[in-house]
């Protein structure tokens, strides 16, 4: 009989993690929508074909890594002008400072600002989606554990209902060293910086519009993966924490914690 309840507990966790994947799918849509916004806004800024008077990718990254204010293209051009520059940089400046290129520079400047706005929106939506899901997950874990305990013992004992404050206390726990909302903020902020860097690399290296769109899409895909990883990790913790609280409510003094490696376990784990 104990084997049945072990399998039942494992199945309950499987269902909770399946729900976590569904929530991660919803968050991934937010990232895809944000990616589409940036890709659309980047249209007509970059050339359809590679231009010759540009820096190599290595040169562009070397320069950007030493440049602090990446929100101002004018300061970027001034920095290039002030540094010891070779023929390629002189030709690049001539092209970027030409009147015909001015409109593109202005659109790119607006796009850099738009990236911050878009990622702020991503952060707010992701935090709202995750918090709502974690609350439901925690409540479900609590009541499901008590229900299973009553079935296993055959006792219909009374128990305290889990309240919102109890769930909020668990959600506020910095169990991994940083609250999940701060981790979401760091992930979205890092992604915003990465996207802006890649847009500037496209400007300096002459990447085409299609190449730029592909890079942006790839980076947002990486952001969605980081968001999914966060949801999986936090979901597992919150479900386990409320399960433990439910056991305590049932008067259980000791329980055996069962863990297993799954296909998503990282190399560190």
Regions found by a protein language model. Give the residues of each.
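N-terminal leader/targeting and assembly helices and adjacent pre-domain segments
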Residues: 1-217
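Acidic, glycine-rich two-metal-ion catalytic cores of nucleic acid-processing enzymes
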Residues: 222-269
């Amino acid at each position: 009989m104990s084997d049945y309840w072990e399998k039942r507990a494992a199945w309950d966790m499987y269902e909770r993690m399946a729900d976590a994947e569904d929530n991660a799918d919803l968050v991934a849509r937010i990232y895809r929508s944000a990616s589409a916004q940036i890709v659309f806004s980047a249209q007509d800024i970059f050339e359809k074909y590679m231009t010759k008077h540009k820096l190599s990718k290595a040169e562009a990254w070397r320069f950007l890594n030493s440049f602090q204010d990446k929100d101002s293209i004018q300061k970027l051009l001034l920095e290039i002008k002030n540094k010891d520059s070779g023929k390629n940089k002189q030709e690049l400046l001539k092209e970027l400072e030409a009147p015909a290129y001015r409109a593109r520079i202005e659109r790119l400047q607006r796009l850099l600002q738009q990236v911050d706005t878009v990622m702020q929106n991503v952060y707010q939506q992701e935090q709202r989606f995750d918090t709502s899901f974690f609350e439901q997950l925690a409540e479900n874990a609590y009541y499901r554990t008590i229900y299973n305990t009553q079935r296993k013992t055959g006792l219909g004992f009374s128990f305290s209902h889990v309240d919102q404050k109890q769930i909020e206390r668990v959600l506020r726990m910095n169990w991994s060293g940083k609250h999940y909302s701060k981790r979401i903020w760091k992930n979205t902020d890092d992604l915003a910086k990465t996207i802006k860097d890649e847009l500037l690399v496209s400007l300096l290296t002459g990447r085409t519009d299609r190449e730029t769109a592909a890079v942006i899409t790839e980076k947002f895909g990486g952001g969605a993966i980081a968001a999914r990883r966060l949801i999986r990790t936090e979901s597992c913790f919150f479900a386990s924490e409320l399960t433990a609280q439910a056991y305590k409510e049932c008067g259980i003094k000791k329980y055996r914690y069962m863990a297993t490696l799954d296909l998503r376990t990282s190399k560190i784990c």
